[in-house]
């Protein structure tokens, strides 16, 4: 009898706990509904974060959020406690230094060696301190100096040789330029991180580097599953390993880590690299030697973060730049005419100072940045205080992010927003340029603007100038489109960009 009573009592407690849990869920959901009832958005987004996560898993989150903005307006609730904005004033306030809004927990996905690089630093003051250590290194006046620019120019010429070899091999003048661009961006990034003496040699034929880069792109396609469903991702990894009898398919991130640590050891063990070369490793080592309390883990995390971000951003941006010029022969010819008028340095490439001021090239690249942003747009911030943007009140601790796609395609700012039209930049008055630039955030905005912007522009403009000084390009299939996945680095679907090359006459 006591046993029966005990079982009955335990069952009653279990039922009560279940009911209390359900009641808590109902109360919390009701509170959230009431708290954000004034912010429009899909009904499913109001009650669960799983709806927007579904589009994340489908690699369509940024595109879907931009679609919701077209439907609901500049403020959209995309999940309980999460709001997306496409209002320019609100965006600038959200990311301003004065707001001091920390980054969200999403950036915990970018921890390396249990340390936070600048990109993953959530708190405003922590980010400001770390950024202050290296910001001068990334300034245009620094990266445009000969010791960084000349090795990059040499790699431009190496990339052109690769393209020529592929043209001959194909027999039809068709080349997939994306892997070549990726190798070029990787070699440039590793040179900036470790110094030219210890950079990678993907352009020169290092198959290990090339294989690693290809696997990193495939690995990123699974990023949303890894971040949102880690147990499922572990199961998929195990199943693939058993089926293929190899762990190589999902080992790219671990292999990159090992590669980076080996290269770090070689760099720090080489007295010449610490004395004669400017690099991120050399900079941080110098700070440590002068008393800055920077741990080994921080140095390692900064290295890996720069390797990921540097090569991925330039690969996507440059691939889309040549894609748009190939798809728009009129603007390609305008760029070529402009390039023909520029003086050349000893290596045959245009003088950088004048190239960087070439207005038509600048306008074309800006249009490419606008139409195809180089990142996912998940620049999430946690509101440090209750905030009001016009008539919209958003409470403290809400996760807020700006939709880059929605801002870049806003028909109230951009006439025929989906059209590649560099003329909008070339014919605009100074006041109109300022108005366009307020809605133009390819490298972010505010206190956390991308540090590598100047180095990225150097790589992109030099590569474009080299191609179109010598060749005409067209799409392999005329009129084809090259859409983007909604991955962290906004990779092109298919991971390729096949162009038809023809030597200029």
From Swiss-Prot:
Induction: Expression is positively regulated by the cluster-specific transcription factor FGM4 and is induced during infection of coleoptiles of wheat seedlings. The fusaoctaxin A gene cluster is silenced by H3K27 trimethylation by the histone methyltransferase KMT6. InterPro entries: Cyt_P450, Cyt_P450_CS, Cyt_P450_E_grp-I, Cyt_P450_sf, Cytochrome_P450_monoxygenase. Belongs to the cytochrome P450 family. Disruption phenotype: Produces significantly smaller lesions and fewer spikelets with blight symptoms on susceptible wheat cultivars. Residues 1-23 form the signal peptide. It comes from the Eukaryota. It comes from Gibberella zeae (strain ATCC MYA-4620 / CBS 123657 / FGSC 9075 / NRRL 31084 / PH-1). Keywords: Glycoprotein, Heme, Iron, Metal-binding, Monooxygenase, Oxidoreductase, Signal. Heme binds at residue 450. This is Cytochrome P450 monooxygenase FGM1. It is an enzyme of class 1 (oxidoreductase). Its EC number is 1.-.-.-. Cytochrome P450 monooxygenase; part of the Fg3_54/C64 gene cluster that mediates the biosynthesis of the octapeptide fusaoctaxin A, a virulence factor that is required for cell-to-cell invasiveness of plant host. The 2 nonribosomal peptide synthetases NRPS9 and NRPS5 form an assembly line which likely utilizes GABA as a starter unit (loaded on the unique module M1 of NRPS9) and sequentially incorporates seven extender units composed of the residues L-Ala, L-allo-Ile, L-Ser, L-Val, L-Ser, L-Leu and L-Leu, respectively. One of its GO terms (molecular function) is monooxygenase activity. Pathway: Secondary metabolite biosynthesis. It holds the Pfam family p450.
